[in-house]
Each structure stands twice: as structure tokens, then as C-alpha cells.
Amino acid sequence: MIDLKLLREDPDVVRRSQLSRGEDPALVDALLTADTARRTAISTADSLRAEQKAASKSVGGASPEERPALLQRAKDLAEQVKAAEATQSETETAFTAAHMAIPNVILDGVPAGGEDDYAVLDVVGEPRALDNPKDHLELGESLGLIDMARGAKVAGSRFYFLTGQGALLQLGLLQLALRLAVDNGFIPMIPPVLVRPEVMAGTGFLGAHADEVYRLEADDLYLVGTSEVPMAGYHADEIVDLSEGPLRYAGWSSCFRREAGSYGKDTRGIIRVHQFDKVEGFVYCAPADAEAEHQRLLAWQREMLAQIEVPYRVIDVAAGDLGASAARKFDCEAWVPTQGTYRELTSTSNCTTFQARRLATRYRDANGKPQIAATLNGTLGTTRWLVSILENHQQPDGSARVPAALVGFVGTEVLEPKG
């Protein structure tokens, strides 16, 4: 949720953020109205309760002649308090809905606009000249790494098996990511992949894109699309100790996405699937440290991309393409030869205090006063990386070179065609 102090003191900042995102700025005025109504209702209910308490006390010391009128007054006030509390409850419900409807306020410098309005911050490496390159699925099948047909037979479209050295390649990649994280002070985690509704909502994933999330109705639990979700809930309703700097976690989990809004997109191969594995970095820090921590996450992602030896670029994602919780997001996109373009391999988001405010995660400032923490997240490795590894390291004889950093995990320097 956005900071109400900012909303009340400078609502135009929130309106401008809404416009940059392509969202309705009228939602800001609706929240201001709901906030005023809620505060008025609380004040009215408090005043009536105080008046009722005083009236009840006066009955005890009243003369017999005064008591009937005072009793009636106390009774009338009790009815008024009941009505005022009902109004307060209604206004609080309306306020919460209006508050939850507004996404995070973007940071200065974030490009305005939609999916295609990003800013390119850096380009690393030159794409190789390849004659008639094979795509990752053709390579994956010929090298015995990916089996989409049996994945579909077992679970339906957008499911797959990673087999043999394909499984080893992914496991090696994720172990490499986890090793990098641990070497940089992250605490490794294997979190739950099912979470309660309040945790999913707290991270901002039950808004406009709720239909992307798998839900187990009988248990009222959600399957996570990223381990960001359980790691954000890890310190819900807690005061965390940031006296020695940010808390950094690295979660390894399977991730699940319905891809409800992507019908017909990336139907071939493992670029867009319902289940994949990922190592995700997650950080709790003081808000003043969040932008510097965002740059650190990006640097660690770039270090991982250097390990797989692929050309990539870094983009500053436009406001309209940010999730509800992100105030800024950087993506690293790797070159995919058969598509002639760059595709996202990592993202890192600065969520400022948006998630922690919803999840009541605080820290103590230098004066010992509890304050809302900031949260950030960033991909350190995921299944989709195999796409770029295979396509960029393919060789004319149909084999694919294994990046040097992964050779020890896979057990070979070259993946050879099977049969």
C-alpha cells in the first residue's frame, strides 16, 4: 500500500505516478475522499463513546428524579454509538478497498508509458553470426534435454520434462546462482510454494493479474509464481533487525503461473510455461538504502549472466509495465538468435515500502522507533535461461557448448546430439 502521509501531503505525486503507469488518476481522489470519510467516522464514533461513558457515570450519582432522563440519554447514546460504529466499519472497508486499488508510486526517472517504452541502460556482448540457427526446443530435443511431448501427455500444454543433461544443466545453473548468493551474504532458503491469501495479497499479486495465480479452493491456498511471495511473508507482522544492514535471502523453489493472459504467445518450448524453477533474491532494508540495494541486486544478476556467456542488455522498465508493487524495475534480457531479439532472463524490483506496509514488516530506526521497511527482489537464475544458453552456444554440427562455469555440474564441455 502507498504511504498515506505522502498521499495527504502531496497527492499530485501519486496522480503523476498513476498517469505514468497509464492508470486512472481519479483513484487518488477516491482514496482521499475515502480517507476523509474514514477519519470523520472514527472521530464521530470516538466522541460518542466518550459521551456515552460520561453519561453512564452520571447515572450512578444522580438523584431519583434525575435518573430516568439520564438513563434514557445513556440508552439513546448507546444506539448512536452502535450506528456510528457501523458507519465506521463501512468507511474502513471502503477505505481499504480504495487504498489497495492504487499501485506503488514510481520513483523519479522511471520511463513513462507501456511495454515498449523502456530505456536501454547497457548492452553487453555481440550476438554471434549463426547460419540457420536451431531454436532451443529443436536443440533440446536433439540433445536429449527437453521433452515437451511427454510433458503435454502427462500434464497438458506448456508442461515439459527436463531429462538427462538438461536436468543437470538446470540444477547446475541454480546451484551456481545459490553459491553466488551465499558468497554475497544471502541466507539460502527453500520456502513453501503454497501461501495464504493474505500473503499473496500482501505482495501485490491479487490485483489486476489475479487470474494468473493458481488457487487451491478447498484449502484456500495459492501456488506461488515466485519465491518472492513466501519470502515477503517470512517477516510479516514482525520488527526485523536491520542494525547491521540489509537482510538478504535467496529462495530456491518451483514456481507456477497460469499464463492466462498469454494465449498464443510463446507456445513453443520453455520460454513461457506453467511450472519452472528459480532462485530468487529477496532483501529487507531501510528505505534510505533501497536504491543502492537495487543496484547491488542488478550487479549480482549481471555477474550471473557473465557466467553463462551470453549477449544481453539491461533495460529500465516503463511505468506501465511495472507490477503493482514495484516502484522501479530493471530487466536483463539475453539475446535469442532464432527470434532476433532480446528476451527477459532476470528482473529486479524496488518495491520501496509498498509490500512491507501491507504485511506489517517494520524495523527500528536510529532512535528505536518502529518504521516500515523496504523490500526488493531479483532473479538470480531460472529455467528460461536454458533457452539462451542452448541457442547462443550451439555449434554447426548440432552440438552445444556448455559454459565453463557449468561444466563441473553437467560433467561435459559439449552436449552432443543423441542417436
UniProtKB/Swiss-Prot annotation:
It holds the Pfam family tRNA-synt_2b. Keywords: Aminoacyl-tRNA synthetase, ATP-binding, Cytoplasm, Ligase, Nucleotide-binding, Protein biosynthesis. GO terms for molecular function: ATP binding; serine-tRNA ligase activity. It catalyses: tRNA(Ser) + L-serine + ATP = L-seryl-tRNA(Ser) + AMP + diphosphate + H(+); tRNA(Sec) + L-serine + ATP = L-seryl-tRNA(Sec) + AMP + diphosphate + H(+). Residues 45-66 are annotated as: Disordered. Homodimer. The tRNA molecule binds across the dimer. Belongs to the class-II aminoacyl-tRNA synthetase family. Type-1 seryl-tRNA synthetase subfamily. Catalyzes the attachment of serine to tRNA(Ser). Is also able to aminoacylate tRNA(Sec) with serine, to form the misacylated tRNA L-seryl-tRNA(Sec), which will be further converted into selenocysteinyl-tRNA(Sec). HAMAP family: Ser_tRNA_synth_type1 (MF_00176). This is Serine--tRNA ligase. It comes from Mycobacterium ulcerans (strain Agy99). The lineage of its organism: Bacteria, Bacillati, Actinomycetota, Actinomycetes, Mycobacteriales.
